[in-house]
Swiss-Prot record:
Keywords of this entry: Hormone, Secreted
Protein name (record): Glucagon
Organism listed in the record: Polypterus senegalus (Senegal bichir)
Cell location: Secreted
GO BP annotation list: adenylate cyclase-modulating G protein-coupled receptor signaling pathway; negative regulation of apoptotic process; positive regulation of insulin secretion involved in cellular response to glucose stimulus; protein kinase A signaling
Family of this protein: Belongs to the glucagon family.
Induction / repression: Produced in the A cells of the islets of Langerhans in response to a drop in blood sugar concentration.
Membrane-spanning residues: none
Length: 29
């Protein structure tokens, strides 16, 4: 991910339970 793509993805997921899964996915890659 570029910084912009990361920011957009985080914004989409931050208000969802998927935010936690998204962070874990980032950490595992």
């Amino acid at each position: 991910h570029s910084q912009g793509t990361f920011t957009n993805d985080y914004t989409k997921y931050q208000d969802s339970r998927r935010a936690q899964d998204f962070v874990q996915w980032l950490m595992s890659n």
